């Protein structure tokens, strides 16, 4: 289906913009192959799911290029803080789409002055040229693996702008992916850098390693990280303390307002910044 453009993200701190960014998100049906050494996998649309997003503008700061916070004054208070984040790209043909939602620690959706400030946005679309249904309201009921914040499943109840009610059940296919392994967070590369830093080549830099993330949360400190240089997106991660991934591959069952049921797959990003009392997380 066509890409969905998120509402523009804008945040300020001490009269300076800290976020000024646009992003589009899009589901897809991939075809081709994946090769690793002598192994090769055929990629066909009926068995694989694709999701992509692209952003441009001023985004979240990342170490080691951002200033060390010890040299800066504390961030100014900005009111209620974001806790819960769901960011979902799905395909359950003939319907596909994208939506995201953010809530505070009491489960209230509101505008936040941060990098992911939008309360709710997105759309469900029938194919490339079919109808598009803007999402006007969303409710969720999530289940987690005992004693963790690792998602097991979540049911979303969505109301579109025309009053139609959709339900989607997402069930995780395995443990979440850790973005640290892509170099997205501080210390993701062996030199201590990240995706924004130079690694010895302006054309292509390659490195590899092996980790076991089958059980989460777990200890994973990255490479050459220092205290205060480890956290990503203000999630409260502390070096030497367990962490977990935040990106899930899920099956999805979509039920339309007319009762039709369609199955597919989804990319679900989900995590918490601090406590979230509706689910008992402190």
Regions found by a protein language model. Give the residues of each.
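Structured soluble/peripheral alpha/beta segments that form catalytic or ligand/cofactor-binding pockets
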Residues: 1-282
